[in-house]
UniProtKB/Swiss-Prot annotation:
Keywords: Chaperone, Cytoplasm, RNA-binding. GO terms for biological process: post-transcriptional regulation of gene expression. This is RNA chaperone ProQ. RNA chaperone with significant RNA binding, RNA strand exchange and RNA duplexing activities. May regulate ProP activity through an RNA-based, post-transcriptional mechanism. Residues 117-136, 146-175 have a biased composition (Basic and acidic residues). Its main location: cytoplasm. NCBIfam families: PRK04950.1. Residues 107-178 are annotated as: Disordered. Pfam families: ProQ (PF04352), ProQ_C (PF17516). Belongs to the ProQ family.
Length: 228
């Protein structure tokens, strides 16, 4: 028991539970509603394994059941399951309504954070513009050197009137090579031709990643079309 590796985070505990109880927990995609009282079942089944404490199990369950993909799975007609995937009764309406409110609040928090970040960017840009518009100190004109009598004036070389236009800087993006590193609520970009649109991860499925664009439209996108 002393030689067992220790799980240091709730995400690691969830990954362990998904491997230990694949018919109950899932590491990605839509999650199934859990049986009421499943915490006690976990304590009895995995108590002592991987040096897991009750506090770690409770924290991992709280993170799992508050994730967007779990809240999406709490819907009318869905059935709760135990650790072995056996049905344990249909969801009650009050539980479905509670999950819906939690999901709405989570989305509102993400939108508020995004709006706050945009406001800070605008403030920084405005501050930079004010510095550029500040009056510059007047420079005193340099004294003109007098030409000696009899000296010939050298013709000035013609300066090029136009400068070659600079090539526009291409914005570099990092492609998403593994969707398992993504988390619900994470901000990224969706490639559309030569452009990349801002988006937020709503759900990670086997077919791809469901994202929501700033326009409010949601769609499922494959990993090769996602970048950071």
């Amino acid at each position: 028991m002393e030689n067992q590796p220790k799980l240091n985070s709730s995400k690691e505990v969830i990954a362990f539970l998904a491997e230990r109880f694949p018919h109950c927990f899932s590491a990605e995609g839509e999650a199934r509603p859990l049986k009421i009282g499943i915490f006690q079942d976990l304590v009895e089944r995995v108590g002592g394994e991987m040096n897991l404490s009750k506090t770690q199990l409770r924290s991992a369950l709280r993170l799992y059941t508050s994730s967007w993909r779990y809240l999406y799975g709490v819907k009318p007609g869905a059935t709760r399951v135990d650790l072995d995937g056996n049905p344990c009764g249909e969801l009650e309406e009050q539980h479905v309504e509670h999950a819906r409110k939690q999901l709405e609040e989570a989305k509102a928090r993400v939108q508020a954070q995004r709006a706050e970040q945009q406001a800070k960017k605008r403030e920084a840009a405005a501050a930079a513009g004010e510095k550029e518009d500040a009056p510059r100190r007047e420079r005193k004109p340099r004294p003109v050197a007098r030409r000696k009598e009899g000296a010939e004036r050298k013709p000035r070389a013609d300066k090029p009137t136009t400068k070659a236009p600079r090539a526009p800087r291409e914005e570099k993006h990092t492609p998403v090579s593994d969707i398992s590193v993504l988390t619900v609520g994470q901000s990224l970009k969706v490639k559309a031709g030569n452009n990349a649109m801002d988006a937020t991860v709503l759900e990670i499925t086997k077919d791809g990643v469901r994202v929501q664009l700033n326009s409010g439209m949601s769609l499922i996108v494959r990993a090769e079309h996602l970048v950071f």
